[in-house]
Amino acid sequence: MKLYKLNTHTRGCNKSYDADLVMNLKDHPNANVGDVVEIYAPDEENGTHLLLQITEFNGSCGRDVISIESGIANAFKMRPYSNVVMRIVKPADVALDSIEITFKDQYMGRSEMWRLKTYLTDTCVYVNKKIDYNDMQIRCQVYEMWSQGERVASGVITEDTKIVFRSSTSMVYLFLQMSSEMWDFDIHGDLYFEKAVNGFLTELFQKWRKLSCNHEVTIVLFSRTFYAAKSLDEFPEHMRDCLQQDYKGRFYEDFYRVAIQNERCDDWCTVLGQLRKLFTSYQATVLRYHERENMKIPPATNSSATQGNFLEVLNISLNTFEKHYLDRTFDRTGQLSVVITPGVGVFSVDRELTNITKQRIIDNGVGSDLVCVGEQPLHAVPLLKFHNKDTTLTSADDYSLPHWINLSFYSTNKKIVYSSFIPRIKLPLFGSQLTLHDGVGDGEGEENERHFLSCNQSEYKHNSLFDYDAYDEQIFQPLPAQSTCSLQRVVRAKKTSVPSLETYAYRNNDWENLTPTQIPAMRRKMSDPDIHHGTSAMLAALQPDTTNLSESLASEKNSRRTIVSIAPIVRPGRALINPFDPSQVTIKLTSNRRRWTHIFPKGPTGVLIQQHHYQAVPAKPTQAGQQRPLQQTQSNNNNDQEDYGCENGEQYDRVSSHSLLNKSDSSQSFVMGDEPIDFFKRRQNSPMNPQPANVPNLTATQAKSYLWGATGEQEWTPAITTVKHLRPIVEGEHHHLGSLEALRALDPPPDAEAGGGRGKIIIGVDWKSLTIPACLPITTDYFPDKRSLNNDYVISDYTLLPDDVNHDYAQSRAVYRKPLSTEEVCKEIVSQRLAQGFQLIVVDEKPPTASGCSSGSAVQPVKLSRETNKEYLLSIGRIFHKISLSGSVITVTGYRPRHPYPPINVDYRYRFHAPQHETYEISGVNFTTEKLENFNWNHMDLYICTRGDVDYPLMESLKYWRYRMYLLPRENIVSKIASCQRCDIFPDVTADNTREQVEDFVRLIEAVSKLKRQYARKARYLASLLQDSPIAHITKRRHSTSIISRPQPNQGLTNSPFRERVGSNRLPEKRPSINVRPKLENGRIPRIFPATDAAAAAGVAARDDQDDGFPVDIKFSPNATLPEIFEAMKHPVNGVGFFSQTQSLPSCTFVSYDALMWLKTRLNNGRHPLDLLEAMRKERMICHASGDWKKPVVPGFVFYYVVQQDKNAKDYAPPLDDYSAFVNEWLEIEFQGCSFLWHDEPVTTPVPNFLRDSPAPQSWTETSSNKRVYRQSHLEIDVNQKSDRMEWGHVKHHTVLQPRFAFEIVVEWVTSSGPIVADLIGGWMRKANQFNFLVSVPADPMAEPFTKKSDPLRGPIFIPLCTTFLPNGAALFDEFPEESRSDRMLFFQEAILGKFGFLPCVLEKKYSVGKDLPKEYQYVHCTGNMFALIRCATNNYQVESPILKEANVTRCVYGHTNNTNVPKKVGFLWAWNHMIPNKKWKAQTINNSADGELFQLKMLKDFREFCSNSDQRLSTFWTQSQELKRRAQKFEFNNNNTEENKMK
C-alpha cells in the first residue's frame, strides 16, 4: 500500500494550486482528469475517508506528494505533512443516494435546479463544499449526503442521485392558533401559549439565527369566535357583513391579527415580546369587538383547536403563494406555511374545503407544517374529522389522514417528578405474539401462527375490533344489477377497516379454505380518491418471493382480477377510517402521494424516512442482504421494557437518523456485524451488492398499508411518537463549526439511551423543514401503468418542427437572432413544465426476477439507438406529459384524466387586523382549485419555438414571471425629513427639476436600450484635428457627473453590447481660435462647447454661451430656410447627432427630443421646433425610423432618420418598412407636459388646480383616451452572455413620460433564469441610481379587500380627511358649480399628497359593463416606500367579487360579496411597499428622534396629523392656496390693464 505525503494549499494564492486536489501525473500514469480518489490515514482505515475528484495535474507538485486545499484538510482532520493512502475508486462504489444543497439570498427557479443537477452529475462533493455555477450565477453549498441508508461526508453524484434543494431565504407564514386551549395549562404547569412562544418559537428563532437564515416572515394570530344565537335577527346590523354559519347552524366569525408582515430580521427574538403583548389582550379584544353601548350582542366564545379555522388558514397562505410569479423577487426562494396549534392534531373540517386544500397544496408544491404543542394522542395524527351532516344515530364519523401535512409535536425538556415514563399503548390484535420473538424456531413459529389463523371464527365473535353494524349492512345489502370490477390501481399491502368476519380471519397467510365468494370488491371512497377498501392484503400474500414494488403490484392486480371476475360483488357499508388502527385501510398509490417523496433519505432498510418520526420498536431481521440480524437485547429484569407485539412479518424501520449514528450496543441501537453504522466509516466495496439500503420498499410478507406520513412508506403504529429529542440532530452545526467534528457531535453518548428506558431519546420537531425548508423536488417516481393510461386518461399529442418554424419566422424579424436548435427547444419545453410545477419522472430499471412477473408500475424508458433521440416523462397532479425528441421532430403527448374533479369555489369572509391598522377590517376571498389541464401548453411551446415572436404573445393564463418597477426622480428624502419635524416639506415642481428629470430619463433609456454615446467615427475632414489638447481627453453629455475616457482613434465599430452613438455630442480635439476654460457652476462641471465655422454656408452666427447639452456654435437667422436648417442638423460634428449603424436602425438615426433641444438653442425668432420637424417630415427630409411615413413627429425618445442621404454610401442602412417589427425591438416613449423645455411659454403665477376656474386634467390619459397606456418590446436578458441557454424576455413600459409622474417598467419572462434576470435588472438599478431611482413595486400595491388577486392578509390603511375646518361650518368649494366639486376634492387631496412627496401613477382605466366606476388616482412616494389612493367619494358604487362559473360553496349568511359598500368617507388609502426588503428601510431610522422612529412610520403619523387638521395645518394649507389664487388674479388683472393701456 503506497503512501503519499500530504501537503495543503490555499486556493487563489497560486494559479498552479487552484483545485481541491493537486497531484503529479508521473505518480499516477493511469489516472485521468475526472477520476475519483479516496484518501485516508493508513492507521485509520475505518476512520474518516475523503473522496476528491481529479480536475487537473500539476508538474510542480513533488513526487509521492499530494496537496489538498487547506479548508478541506482541516474539516476532515488531515494533518499536513502526514502520510496518507490514496487510491482510485469507481464512482459507482461511492455513489450518493441523495444529497441536500442549501442556498441563500437568491432566486433559483425549478428550471435552474434541473440545470444545476445536470451540471453536478458525475462530480465529487463533500460536506460544506461551495458550488459556484457560473453559467447560471448560482451559489450554493452541500449540506448533507446519504448513501446506503446512512449519512456520509463525501461521495459522487450520479444520474440516480436525488438532489434536494433547501433555501435559507424563504417566504414563511407562521400562524399561531389562538384557540381556547392557549389559555390552558399543560402537564408541566405552563400555559400552552408560553409553550408555543417561549418554547417552540424561541427555539425556532435561535436555529434561524444559528444557520444565518434570512426568511421573509409573516406572523399571524388567528381564532374562531362562536356566537350563541339561533337566528340572524339576534345580531345588530353592523355585525352581519362577516357572519358565517357552519353545518350545525352555529354563527361564527374568524379573526386574524397580523403581528409581523413580510419582515426580515437578524434576531427574531425581539418579536417574542410583541407576541406576548398581543396575547394579553387578544381574547378580550376579539370576544368584545362588537360591543356597543345600549346594544345587545349574543354571547361570544372562543372555539377549541378542533373546531377552529385550520384549513382556512392554509388556503389564505396559498392565495398569496400561488401568485408568486406576479411579485417575483430575486433574493428568496421557497414558500412555507406553518400552523402552530395548542391542540393535538385533530380538526373538524368541511369535506369540500379539504379537497380544495389538498389539491392546492400538492399542485402548488408548498410546504405545509403543523406543529402541535399539545400532548400527542394514542391514535394517528394529523386527523381530519369531516363534518357529519347526517344527524341519524346510525351515522358514523368519517376521518381522513392527510399525507400532505408535515406533522411535528413539540414538548419541553421538563421532567415530571413522579415519572419519566411516556406510555405508548397498543392493544394486541388477537393474542400474544411472544412466540415470534422468544427464540422459538421458525418452523414452530409458523405452525403456531397457522394454527391460530385456522381456528374457528366463532371464538373471536366478541372481539371489540369488529363493527357489527357495518358488517350487517354489508351482508344484507342487495346485490347490484350488474357485477363490475374496479380498474383503479391498488398498491402496497392492503387491509380493510370494515372487513367481513371471513375476510378478517384469513387476512394473513392461510388460504386453504378461501373461496372467491368471500371476497368483497373494491369500493371507491368519495371523500378521498386515494383510499380504497378491499382484499389486496390476501392477494399480495400469494407472491411470497416478490422482490420489488412494481412486480408485487402487477402480480397483485393480476391475481385480484382473476378472482374478482367470477365473484359476485358484495359492497361493504360505510367505508370508514379507524384512527386507532389506520393500517386496516387500503391506500391507492397516486402521483400526489409521491410528489414530495424524493426529499426524504432512505433508511437502512431502503424505506424513505422522516427523521423526526421515531419508532420505538426495533426492526425485525431480514433474511437476505445482511451480514447478521440486527441485534436486540432483551432483559426480563427490566420492568420498564414493554412488548409492543409485532405482527407476523412486520418489519419496523427505525427512522431516527440518531440510530444511524449510535455506537451503543443497547437494545435501541443498530449494529451490523461488529461495526456500528457511522457515516464516516469506510464504505462497502460496492453499493450494487444486496445491502440493506437496497431492500425493496415493500415485501409481500410484510402485508402493510402505508396510510400515514408524508413519505408514503411509513406505517403508523402506536409505537411511533414525535416527542422532543433531547439533542436535536438536524441543526446543521457544521455550517458554523467548519469541520466534520460537528457531524461527529451528532452521535449521542454511548449510554444515552441505556439508562432511561425506552421511548426517551426521541425526535419530535422537523427542525430541518422549519429552518431550511426544502423546495419541491424536481423528480418523482410514479407513472400510471399502460392499462390505467388507456382506461382512465384522455390522450392528446402534437408535433413541433422547430427548424421549419425558425426558417419561417427568421425572415420577418427586425433583428436576426440565432434560433434555438431542436434539442435546445426540447430542453426548454421541459424547463417550462418544471417551472410550472411539473416533475421529471425517473423510473428505475429493475432486472427480471425469478417470479417472472412483468412490471406494471410505470412506462419503462425507451432504449434509444441514436443520441438525438430523447424522452422525458413529467407529471403534476393527475396530468402527465411525455416529450419525445426524434431527429428534428418533437412530439408532445399529454395525458389528462378522463373524469376530472369538478371545480369547487369557496367564498370565505373574515376580519383581519394588519400592522398600523386601527380595527379589524372585513375582507373576503375565494378558495378555488385550478384546472391544470386547461393550461395552453401548445401556445407556450410555439412561443418557445418562435423565440418569443409577436404571433404568440405571453398571455395572463401562461402565468409568466414579471418584475414591476417605478422610475422616480431622485431626491435625498430621508435626510430632508430627518432635519425637519414635519414631512410636508416637498416643494412644487420647477422648470429646472423637470429638465433634469427628463435628461436623466433619456440617459437611463439609452442604457436599457444598449445605446451609448461615445466616440465611434470621425468625419474624414476632421482627421487632421485628432491631436492632443488639454481638454481633448474628456467629454461630457448633458448633466452627467461622470467623465468618459476618449477612445482610441482606431476604435471604430466594436463588438460591445452597446450600440454606439456619434455626432455632435463630442469635442473637436483642437480649436486654436477658441479658449475654452471649464468652470464649476453650482458644483457641477459645465459642458464645453467649442465653436466651428462649418455652418457658415447656412448664414449663421457663432455662439458658445449656451449650456443645453449640445455644441452651440450657430444661431439661425430669422429668415433661415427649412433646407438650411436641415443641412445644419445633418452636420457630422455640430448636427443633432446620430447613432452608429446597428441592426434594425437605419443610418443617420436620432431621437426627436435631441432634435427639439438642438433647434431650441438655435432659433431666436419664436419659431416652434416641433413645427419645424413636422415640416421636415412632410417634405420627406426625415421619417420615423421604421420607414412609416404616416407617423408624425412626436416629442420624446422616439426614433427618426434622415431620408435625404447618400444611399450609395458604404454605411447606408435602409429602414425596415415594418412598424410593428420595429416597435417590438425598440423602446419609444413620448414626452408630455414638458413642452416648455423646447419652446418658450409665458410664465404664469401657479394656481392650485383645485381652485382654478377650469381644472387641468389629472394626467395625459384623460385627454388622450385613445392612446395606449403600455407598450411591450422584446428584451435580450443575457446581455453579458453568461448563460448556457438562450434567454429572452419582454419589457412593458408606459408609452408617455410626464414629469413628476412615476414611469412604470415591467420585465416579463418565461425562458430566462432568475439569477440572469436579477443581474440585468441590478445593472439597470445601478445605472438608474446615478440619475433617478428605480424601485420595485407589487403588482397590486393597495391589495384592497374583495379583489381577485389581492393578498388576503394585506389591506390599505384608511386615513380620513377632515372637511369641516372652514369657519362657520362652511363647505369646501361652495363657490364653484356643484358638478365640479367632486373632482375638485380629488385635486385637493392630490395637492396634499404632493406636499408629502407623492407622485401620481398612470394606470389603465377599469371598465365595467353597465356600471359607473368611480374616478380613482394612485400615487407612490418618491422613496418608493408607500402608496396612496384617492377615490371619488360621491359615486354610489359597490365592489364585487369576481364572477366565477364554478359552483359556489359559501357559508356567508348575509347576502353576497357585492353588498359590501366601499366607505363613502373622504380620505386616503395608504399602503406599504412590501417589495422593498424591510432591512433597507429599517436602516432609514430618524436618528434625531427620541425613540429612533422609523422614517415610514413618521411619514404615516405626520400625514394622519395633517389630515386631521392637527395644529390647524390643514386650514393653513387651504388659506395659503386661496392666497395664491388671489395673487394670480391680481397679476392677471394688472397684465390686462397694461395691455389695454398700450392699445390706447
Curated annotation (Swiss-Prot):
Basic and acidic residues bias: start-end ranges: 1058-1072
Family annotation (Pfam families): DEPDC5_CTD (PF19418), IML1 (PF12257), IML1_N (PF23013)
UniProt-annotated stretches for the region Disordered: 615-649, 1037-1072
Keyword Lipid biosynthesis: no
One of the GO BP terms on file: negative regulation of cell size
Signal peptide start and end residues: none
Biased composition (Polar residues): 623-639, 1041-1057
GO cellular component, as recorded: GATOR1 complex; lysosomal membrane; lysosome; Seh1-associated complex
Inactivation phenotype: Pupal lethal. Under nutrient-replete conditions, larvae display a significant increase in TORC1 activity, indicated by increased phosphorylation of S6K/p70S6K. RNAi-mediated knockdown in the female germline results in a large percentage of ovarian cysts delaying mitotic exit. Instead, cysts undergo a fifth mitotic division before meiotic commitment to produce 32-cell cysts with a single oocyte. Double RNAi-mediated knockdown with GATOR1 complex member Nprl2 in the female germline increases the penetrance of ovarian cysts displaying delayed mitotic exit and producing 32-cell cysts.
Domain of life: Eukaryota
Keywords assigned: Cell cycle, Cell division, Meiosis, Mitosis
Gene Ontology MF, one: GTPase activator activity
Subunit annotation: Component of the GATOR complex consisting of mio, Nup44A/Seh1, Im11, Nplr3, Nplr2, Wdr24, Wdr59 and Sec13. Within the GATOR complex, probable component of the GATOR1 subcomplex which is likely composed of Iml1, Nplr2 and Nplr3.
Family according to the record: Belongs to the IML1 family.
Function summary: An essential component of the GATOR subcomplex GATOR1 which functions as an inhibitor of the amino acid-sensing branch of the TORC1 signaling pathway. The two GATOR subcomplexes, GATOR1 and GATOR2, regulate the TORC1 pathway in order to mediate metabolic homeostasis, female gametogenesis and the response to amino acid limitation and complete starvation.
Protein name, UniProt field: GATOR complex protein Iml1
